[in-house]
Each structure stands twice: as structure tokens, then as C-alpha cells.
A protein has these predicted regions:
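Intrinsically disordered, low-complexity Ser/Thr/Pro/Gly-rich regulatory segments
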Residues: 1-81, 86-189
């Protein structure tokens, strides 16, 4: 096989991967838009599970995706319920977990995800963002470094915050709402 033929095969593989992702995107989008007019909360939970499945396919295995959890900080600040929490379960244990009730320390949280359908209540999303911003990591907590652990003063950053992600079906999201989030994922019909 000559070099040109080898390059063509590689390009074909990359094209197949791209097509598979486009197919997956279409399938996920169709699932997200399936309506269940009988019971709204059921549909919301269903959509959260779909978004969680998407993140589960792309995140490293060290992360756990929890649905319907609360974040707590060392000053006893507690968030409102968060649709999806992406956390490092190996780093910090749960504060409390029993059945579906989960309280997760802010230090373990890598990302928080707000899942919305086609109607977004701007006021509640702003409150959600403000609640997340209020939570603080403990100054004396153990900090992760690339492959080491440190406690106490070092040349590292003193605090982190979770990445904020909005997953929605609504295509008309205001700039004000977008500013609350680091990433916005919109499903297209």
C-alpha cells in the first residue's frame, strides 16, 4: 500500500467518525424533543438522563455524573437542587448520600449542569447561577495538583469553582443567560 492510499484510508476513518458523531447527535436530539405532555417532571428527568448519557460518553472515567444533587460548602452554604453534577468521586467523599438524596462538597465538583426544555425562566436561572457563585471551597482543603497533593499555603490557586453548563432545547437564549454559563449546549430539531 502506497502513502497516498494510506492517507486516503485515514481520511475515510476520520470521515466515518465524524458521520457517527453526527448520527449520534441526531439521535440524542430526537430523544430530547420527545414530548410527554402527561407529566412534566417525568419528561424533565428523562431529558436530564439523556444529557447525562452524553456527558458519560465524553468524560474521563474518573468523573461521576449525579442527577438531582445539592452542593455544600465548608461554611454550610447549600445550593438549590442541581440537575446534573459532574464530580470527582475519588477526590472527596459525599457529605451525605442516601437513595436519591445527595449532598456533595464543592471541592469535589468539576461542573454543574442546568437542563432546560423550550421554556427558560430567566429569573430562576439567574438565582441558580447566583447560588452557585456563593459557594466557596475551604481554604484548608486538600488541593489536587497534576499528580501530587498539597495542603496549606503553596504556590497554587486558593480556590476553584465548578464549570457551569446550560443544556437546553430553546434556541433563543438571551445574552444575559449565556453570561451565567461557561458553556451552552443547544439541541437542534
Amino acid at each position: 500500500m502506497d502513502e497516498k492510499e494510506s492517507d486516503n484510508r485515514k481520511l475515510k476513518v476520520v470521515e466515518n467518525i465524524r458521520e457517527n458523531y453526527q448520527s449520534l447527535e441526531g439521535m440524542i436530539s430526537k430523544q430530547l424533543f420527545m414530548g410527554n405532555e402527561l407529566h412534566g417532571p417525568t419528561t424533565g428527568s428523562f431529558r436530564e438522563e439523556i444529557w447525562a448519557g452524553l456527558f458519560g460518553q465524553i468524560l474521563p472515567k474518573k468523573f461521576v455524573i449525579e442527577q438531582s444533587a445539592f452542593i455544600i460548602d465548608s461554611e454550610e452554604g447549600i445550593s438549590k437542587e442541581i440537575d446534573l453534577v459532574i464530580m470527582d468521586e475519588m477526590y472527596t467523599p459525599y457529605i451525605f448520600r442516601y437513595g436519591k438524596l445527595k449532598f456533595i462538597p464543592i471541592e469535589a465538583v468539576a461542573a454543574v449542569v442546568e437542563c432546560k426544555s423550550q421554556s427558560i425562566d430567566e429569573r430562576s436561572v439567574k438565582e441558580w447561577g447566583a447560588e452557585i457563585k456563593k459557594l466557596r471551597t475551604a481554604k484548608e482543603s486538600v488541593a489536587r495538583l497534576a499528580n501530587m497533593i498539597t495542603k496549606g499555603p503553596t504556590g497554587t490557586q486558593l480556590s476553584t469553582r465548578p464549570i457551569r453548563i446550560l443544556c437546553a432545547l430553546d434556541q433563543n437564549i438571551s445574552a444575559e443567560i449565556k453570561e451565567i454559563f461557561d458553556f451552552v449546549l443547544l439541541a437542534a430539531k
